[in-house]
């Protein structure tokens, strides 16, 4: 199903995010593990409420694992990740008692005994509590059963202030939920509530990341798996604002108290020349006392210049 938006009286085709690609690939790989056969296509409903159906590519499998890829389609948006393959490798983790342990941990955390009963409640309230606990388990189990990590071409977080903690794969929260929900639905349908490991990789992401803002944000070694709606809207102002907000969060986590932003190429060029000259003067005059502030100012200038004059970071605009 193709979706379009209008920008400046132009009809532009929407695409789908790397997060949607990852979830669809994971869905396809897990389906193979459960059924032993590949589908030609996979489909899911994005958080925006728009269904996406894609072809599966690079389908391979081995003893206890399966892997496939989905090709990113950014629609009419300019995006360095357009056309790259997003892979998902699925493996069942062998732990016979895992589900029982997860179930018991949820019962205990809810104040229930081993039989699922909570002391001191009437039979009717016990029944209601059991229903509530079952709903709680259903909500929590996808996170418990589906482990997600990044492989080659997926960046690693090295700075605070981003969506994921330092050391984690740069797979944002919404894509993680999309992956877990897609996988858990298949497990539940098959009656196979087993621990699954999902590894997302983008071999072309190593080179693509060099054209993105990720290195400045503290995301090293690859691209990010992104998307809050699952859909790429071409020339999205909201995505531009979110890109700037992400960098500001990183600067805030580093203790920066101010940044400088400018409109357009002329403003960026003026800021670059003025801050470098003024910063050098201040540093010389005060024997380096303003060096940290000068570095901060120059970095702020680079941020403004990079984002506002050369185009917004494409892989962050999903």
Where are the language model's segments positioned?
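Ubiquitous "structural anchor" signal
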Residues: 27, 33, 57, 119-124, ...
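A structural signal for small-residue-enriched, beta-sheet-centric alpha/beta enzyme cores
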Residues: 3-6, 13, 19, 214-223, ...
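Intrinsically disordered, low-complexity terminal tails and inter-domain linkers enriched
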Residues: 93-144, 278-310
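Generic N-terminal targeting/processing segments that precede catalytic cores or assembly contacts
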Residues: 1-106, 127-217
């Amino acid at each position: 199903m193709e979706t379009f938006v209008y920008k400046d009286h132009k009809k532009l085709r929407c695409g789908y995010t790397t997060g949607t690609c990852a979830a669809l690939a994971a869905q396809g790989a897990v389906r193979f593990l459960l059924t032993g056969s590949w589908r030609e296509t996979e489909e899911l409903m994005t958080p925006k409420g728009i269904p996406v159906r894609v072809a599966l590519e690079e389908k391979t499998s081995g003893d206890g694992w399966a892997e496939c890829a989905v090709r990113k389609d950014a629609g009419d948006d300019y995006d360095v990740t357009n056309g790259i393959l997003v892979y998902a490798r699925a493996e069942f983790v062998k732990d016979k008692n895992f589900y029982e342990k997860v179930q018991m941990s949820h019962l205990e955390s809810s104040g229930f005994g081993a039989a699922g009963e909570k002391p001191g409640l009437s039979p009717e309230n016990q029944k209601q509590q059991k229903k509530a606990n079952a709903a709680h388990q259903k909500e929590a189990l996808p996170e418990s059963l589906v482990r997600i990590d990044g492989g080659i071409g997926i960046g690693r977080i090295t700075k605070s202030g981003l969506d994921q903690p330092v050391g984690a794969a740069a797979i944002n929260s919404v894509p993680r939920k999309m992956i877990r929900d897609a996988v858990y639905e298949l497990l539940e349908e098959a009656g196979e509530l087993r621990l699954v490991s999902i590894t997302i990789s983008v071999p072309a992401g190593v080179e693509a990341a060099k054209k993105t803002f990720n290195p400045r944000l503290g995301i090293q070694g690859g691209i990010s798996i992104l998307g809050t709606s699952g859909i790429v809207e071409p020339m999205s102002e909201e995505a531009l604002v979110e890109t700037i907000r992400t960098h500001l969060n990183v600067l805030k986590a580093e203790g920066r108290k101010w940044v400088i932003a400018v409109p357009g190429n002329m403003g960026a060029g003026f800021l670059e020349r003025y801050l470098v000259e003024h910063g050098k003067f201040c540093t010389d005059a005060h024997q380096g006392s303003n060096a940290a502030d000068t570095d901060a100012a120059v970095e702020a200038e680079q941020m403004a210049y990079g984002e506002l004059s050369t185009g917004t970071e494409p892989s962050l605009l999903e």
